[in-house]
Amino acid sequence: MKRQTQHPSDGVAEPLRSATRTSSPHLCPEISLRLAPAGLSLDAFRLAHPDICGAAPPYWAVAWPGGQGAARYVLDHAALVAGRRVVDFGAGSGLLAIAAAMAGAAHVRALDRDPVATAVCALNARMNAVFIEAETVNITTTETADADIVLAGDLWYERMDARQATRLLRSLAGSGIAVLIGDVGRSELPRSGIDWLASYRLPADEGLERSAVVETRVGWLAP
């Protein structure tokens, strides 16, 4: 499997800084991220910055609610990750990876299939004064056997990707790796086999959600 580790100096850092704005997720005010300007849809952001995004949806440009909830839970329950090897699966902006690093994880990897996302992860990690390894991989086939805990937020938007992610995450859980997920209850989220731990309400981006306020839940995924 080909892996590419990204660093914030990999040529896209300056364009990313110009295109994005620094903001803090509602549930994680202690974390700063480079995100799309408020009120700008993903499509509008992609069309405005084709040199950065290409044809891929810039999922990394939003602090999605499931990731916010899971990151908040990790920050409030640091013992879950302290001293452990953590993987942020489908990392996007790197919010979960950064939360794990801030909570004392021994080693953190942020995995995403979009090379721009992994560059963003590295940029955001540097901005928050934490170290993570950001890698571009095929997240539906990648191996995470060197992890103690896998974090995953908002992977259940699109049917094919959601089903592949669920199969892989359940397989990881079956191998003894703890899998913590966060989601707002989208249609492709498994309806069983999740031990819910907490829920959070937060303002939603009305361009991305169907209501002004959403409830996101965090839980352990069973095999």
Cite the ranges covered by each PLM segment.
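S-adenosylmethionine-dependent methyltransferases
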Residues: 1-223
